[in-house]
């Protein structure tokens, strides 16, 4: 099972119910809605479709609202665009004007206060570079020199690398969009152009004052100021997005890979999800196959430790949206198979942990790797336990069983976590039973698999995880008194007396009988294990089994009736348990 999550941007190329169904089947975990485009009616229709299709498919899909953010853009140009020529001069006006060969204006009227002579201004994703040569504050004009030629059209992005601007953390449009998201029940807010912790707190205050405190805030790090303030930003956030598009314009491109690794590592240490985004499979907007560099980019983000990888134009507007998700899924699966999870968990074990839940998470991950378990089952009310286990990268899926749909969608972004919505349990026994039954029902685990189950007392209270159990998921057939510590697996021979036992080939079989005796010895000597209805450590079966060194289970009531002849079973002498089929027993 793939552990790295896939975030898909939903747009005209993917908004139909048919395409959404295909994206979910291909592996989409979180649907991103880009509020830089479209109106509330369009986004509501998309949200409704995503929820409906996910419900019909029985899948958990989170919804991420990506704000437009406090960006700077150019205003309109005469005839739609200007031709800027290297070496010529052009002014930037703080008052809105129609752009011409002498002057154009931008949407941020305090730009003149933020730049100085020598400052660099980048236009249209950095394709055009201007250098500030002077300012006329009285007239509200910035004088610039055109460093490289290009066509400048309407509403193009403006970046000022290395300059701290006075833009607000949240615009009026952002606030309206976030309130819309609260009403529609989205799960995550991706906050664009976050520069400092106060930007995040401004959004959090809006959420808390409007019954939206359950929404998680994922700041997008897109400028040098955000990079410089990353620790304070992460402290007040629920995760991060490495938004490499604007980031690669705001800082030198050669620094982007280093910043990416640094941000991912900080999120890993904090146990918070991180999304790596922008141009991951960009060529698949037009082509059915990615470039080799793109495949390596996705793989390296996974090696870095990212929780999620994101598709933007590939799924929103591209020709091959489903193929893009399928490709990303294959790259992720192949990459994850090459990761040394023992090394990862050993490195993270050296970090300090300050609470019981995290200690259990660390222990569960380490034990999962040592025992090569099929999954870790983590019943949870808040999702915190599942996050803490995933933080230590157990190398197997973390199945988070919760009674809250909201909690399940929050976990859709967490590495390795597969949420299931189940019934609310009121006791430890119910928790264990519910988590196993739901995991089997969803086919994440099967009979015979070894799993780890975490739980907490008192039941139902967040942050009380204090129990870890190693459990064999088995189709339990019968139970008795085991003698010895061995396990036997094989075909059964059911015989009620010596004559029946000797009539069958017992070589390597498990002999099931009422009670053994001296006449049955030739059959017993060839068998792999012995099960008797007769109980007691002094019974013939117990004594003979010990002398032969084979696993024995005695005192199994109605064994010759319960256990069918010729069936494959597993007997665990240490626990005295008999399972149908081939069960993994520790």
From Swiss-Prot:
Known EC number(s)?
A: 2.7.1.40
Residues noted as binding substrate in the record, renumbered to the chain? 32, 245-246, 278
Q: Which residues bind ATP?
A: 34-37, 73, 156
What reaction(s) does this enzyme catalyze? pyruvate + ATP = phosphoenolpyruvate + ADP + H(+)
Needed co-factor(s):
Mg(2+); K(+)
Question: Which GO terms label this protein's molecular function in UniProt?
Answer: ATP binding; kinase activity; magnesium ion binding; potassium ion binding; pyruvate kinase activity
Q: Return the SUPFAM superfamilies for the record.
A: Phosphoenolpyruvate/pyruvate domain, Phosphohistidine domain, PK beta-barrel domain-like, PK C-terminal domain-like
Q: Kind of enzyme, top EC level?
A: transferase
Pfam short name (any one): PK
- The answer on whether this UniProt entry bears the keyword Cell membrane reads no
Tell me which UniProt keywords the record has, alphabetically.
ATP-binding, Glycolysis, Kinase, Magnesium, Metal-binding, Nucleotide-binding, Potassium, Pyruvate, Transferase
* Sites where the protein binds K(+): 34, 36, 66-67
Listed binding positions for Mg(2+) are 222, 246
Q: Where is this site: Transition state stabilizer?
A: 220
Its UniProt pathway annotation is:
Carbohydrate degradation; glycolysis; pyruvate from D-glyceraldehyde 3-phosphate: step 5/5
Q: How does it assemble?
A: Homotetramer.
Similarity comment text for this entry: Belongs to the pyruvate kinase family.
Under what name is this protein listed?
Pyruvate kinase
Q: Which organism is it from?
A: Sporosarcina psychrophila
Q: What is the gene called?
A: pyk
